[in-house]
Amino acid sequence: MSTSTFNRRWAGVILEALSRHGVRHLCIAPGSRSTPLTLAAAQHPAFTPHTHFDERGLGHLALGLAKASGEPVAVIVTSGTAVANLYPAVIEAGLTGEKLVVITADRPPELIDCGANQAIRQHSIFGSHPAATLDLPRPTPSIPAAWLISAIDETMGALAAGALHINTPFAEPLYGELDETDLTWQQAPGEWWQTTTPWLRYEKIQAVSAQADWPFWREQRGVVLAGRLTAQEGEAVAQWAARLGWPLIGDVLSQTGQPLPCADLWLAHPRAAALLAQAPVVVQFGGSLTGKRVLQWQSECRPQEYWVVDPLPGRLDPAHHRGRRIVADISAWLEQHPAHPMMPWDEPLEGLAAQTQRIVARELTEWGEAQVAHRLPELLPPDGQLFLGNSLTVRLVDALAQLPAGYPVYGNRGASGIDGLVSTAAGVQRATGKPTLAVLGDLSTLYDLNALALLRDAPAPFVLIVVNNNGGQIFSMLPTPAREREKFYCMPQNVCFAPAAAMFSLNYDAPESLAALKEAVTRAWRSSVATVIELRVPETAGAQVFSRLLKAVCA
């Protein structure tokens, strides 16, 4: 049997084993060393292939697919720096829990550290960021297929969240006709090929046990803090908190409907902390909190009990409260801890939030990114989804908008980087097929500009709003040195995105008022071609308006 044929069979077994663990989407970059994997993937009926020429964007595309589907997603790349380009996506998956299966083709061992072309040290290249790493040997018939299958089953069976890095070397030749004369190695697993289940099945028993003293605590005053949740979890948490009569502080990614809107503003009011301090227990669901004032309150509050409930491992509490870290499925935990109907105790907080919302509506009458953030719910497509970028964009929406409960909202708030955001949004849409609104800043869009190529194949209307405030204006909200701020922090690029949209044959619009923006978005929802909408806004106006609102709320 030729080397190229056995490489293909080895790769085919890897992918077949992964398909038994729910992998449906494969993201593939061009490359020669990965040929056995690519050809095996192309011929496998269980996979939906996605391609992209930029491995960094490809990793984020896979991240978005995993984020929205809730399934493991595989990535195939060739050897060399192609592997290193996946690093940001691997880091984000490790922090937010998406299951990424990163399959990296490698040179065989004798070509490492000897000057061979495109050969780097890929062993443990991602350091501690993957949840698991599997370094496979050079394909050889002397290693039974059952070993290879069970190695995949073991790592996938134990993978609760995060990335799995599978490094697999392939020797040349990589090309050639598939030799069908000797199938002994491939056929050794027997009837496994006719089934759809793993060779080695790992049983996970994840029963959620109730907190023994919950009947006591549910009778007390409490506060619910909601971070990043799914739409289903967000609605359930909101209903649970309302039934308990506990105030709910919801992050922009909580999908709870934020019943106390504009929390990142009203928490700056002197009365807020004192009112919340009346609660002896705080229950936090999910991590990745966005708002500065929310994080400050979370850090400074000192309840008798602080509980963090999330399926991901780790503390998820940068303030290091004394309390309980409950690793559990949130929906299952809520079922085990039913709410006892209580009268709300947070009327003063409701009044504070309502007053803040009135101030926001009164102040935000002029065109700009703050007004767009406040009125963003009016732009959402029915039965669609929202993807928010990082930096100033997500903070303004978090503080100024009240998003509908249960409306899907996505973002990369693990490492909160501005890389790969267009790619991630494209992956989110490919997983769901829903109309998608993405809102990013100009630097974030520039950072991932070639990912506009991914929007050419959008399965539903896609609107990318680029808030062009000419640089990283988040630094205008920070105490950066005034003299160095523009050159070394904000870094204005003075660009227009119309040529970029034209390059990738996308629609383009540049409205200059809220009414014109609504008209542009309405047109875009009727188009089968993705639309880039550029909002050219005053550079520092967003930061200045936010500062003014904080002062007005605290007055």
From Swiss-Prot:
Binds 1 thiamine pyrophosphate per subunit. InterPro entries: DHS-like_NAD/FAD-binding_dom, MenaQ_synth_MenD, MenD_middle, THDP-binding, Thiamin_PyroP_enz_TPP-bd_dom, TPP_enzyme_TPP-bd. GO terms for biological process: menaquinone biosynthetic process. It is an enzyme of class 2 (transferase). Pathway: Quinol/quinone metabolism; 1,4-dihydroxy-2-naphthoate biosynthesis; 1,4-dihydroxy-2-naphthoate from chorismate: step 2/7; Quinol/quinone metabolism; menaquinone biosynthesis. It catalyses: isochorismate + 2-oxoglutarate + H(+) = 5-enolpyruvoyl-6-hydroxy-2-succinyl-cyclohex-3-ene-1-carboxylate + CO2. GO terms for molecular function: 2-succinyl-5-enolpyruvyl-6-hydroxy-3-cyclohexene-1-carboxylic-acid synthase activity; magnesium ion binding; manganese ion binding; thiamine pyrophosphate binding. Signal peptide: none annotated. Homodimer. Belongs to the TPP enzyme family. MenD subfamily. This is 2-succinyl-5-enolpyruvyl-6-hydroxy-3-cyclohexene-1-carboxylate synthase. It comes from Cronobacter sakazakii (strain ATCC BAA-894) (Enterobacter sakazakii). The gene is menD.
